Amino acid sequence: CEALKLAAQDCDQNSVSISFAPTKDSTINITNKNILHCAFMYTQILKDILLTINFDDSHINEFADNSSELVNVNEIAKEYRDHQPIWWYTRETFLFSVLNRALRLMDADIIIKMAFFISDLHKNITDLHSKQFHDQTSSQSFIVYRGQSLSQTDFNQLKQNQGGLLAFNNFLSTSKNRKTALDFIHRNLGKNEFVSILFVMHIDPSIYSTPFAHVPKINAIDEEEEILFSMHSVFRIGKIKQFSDNTQIWEAELTLTDNNDPQLRQLSETIQKETSGSTEWNRLGLLLIKLAKFDKAEALYTILLKQTIDQKEKANIFHQFGCINKDRGEYSKALEYYEKSLEIMKKTLPANHPSLATSYNNIGLVYYSMGEYSKALEYYEKSLEIRKKTLPANHPDLATSYNNIGLVYDSMGEYSKALEYYEKDLEISKKTL
């Protein structure tokens, strides 16, 4: 029985995923998926979301109602408020495994159902951190350890990103006891194609942007010297080397970062800019669309559509469904959703609202992709008309409209007209780029 427990714990420990941001010399670009890992941005935005949403008992009951097939779910529904979230997380229930799996796979459905618990656990760790480390300074820095098996792909990325940033996408269990981490490694040596690695983590207790806490006194399993970090803890990657006495094991030095880290601050600003949206959930959906995770984006917006009665929000969701299907190449479906969105916006927004211009423009894009150039021109011109009335003369959106109309005339063989609009686009671009 004890062996089975250890095997289950080892499996859960290895399921904690990591993601990488570019090194200091790399260009930050959301469209460069090899440089900026999707999961790094996903969990950062998810963390932002959970800090802005208020949860109550109805969310716990909803989770129980939708998860009745899971063991212990009724106990959790009845007794959830009787214990701290860390107690539930470290107890031998399904919560640990299901939550880490959802964060690893970026499963929007499960994450939304468990959002109340993710939020509560983060707040619990933050509160304990404040109590345990409130009077400590950088001079009292300490080291924690974590043993983990990495896939060869992740290990190669780790080596390639030395000097860059690494994020643990899940909640992260570590130990101040080096032997505890090494025991895990020795139990997993030689398994499959994985690389055994000991993370040696240097922790400045004065860093509050990444909460962590001692948990032995409230840990249901009651392991000693455990430090639990909240999700998306970000570290700077230092030296990576093989053990001198066992070349099967590698050691990687990590240093906890804070919000003052210039690269992390720049990255956070980029994430905010590239995924601006009306709500935090909408930001997450936009990110998934940008990274071509269309099924996950569709699942998220389907849930959001069921939860809202606000007409403007429905219009936005239908618009995003249109974007998803446009990018999939399913143009008839895209038109259907864009037109649903446009119908609502016409009823709820002023006649010259910028969102209407965006909607007309995107419908034009679909018709252009379908080769229906006269229809595309009709909608591009409607978009341009609004933009000329509401935007400054050198606004980039006007340049986009001129370029789009130029492309239509180009495709129709009307080259003099195409040239006229291309030149208008160029004139603005020279002033703004």
Predicted regions and their residues:
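Mono-ADP-ribosyltransferase
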Residues: 1-347, 355-368, 378, 403-407
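Short coil/turn linker motifs that delimit alpha-helical repeat modules in TPR/alpha-solenoid proteins
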Residues: 273, 310, 349-352, 391-394, ...
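Amphipathic alpha-helical segments of tetratricopeptide repeats
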Residues: 303-306, 342-347, 384-389, 426-430
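Alpha-helix boundary/capping segments in eukaryotic regulatory proteins
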Residues: 329, 352-354, 371, 394-395
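Polar, glycosylation-prone regions of secreted, cell-surface, and some intracellular proteins
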Residues: 334, 346-348, 418, 430-432
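Acidic, glycine-centered low-complexity repeats within long intrinsically disordered regions
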Residues: 336, 343, 357, 378, ...
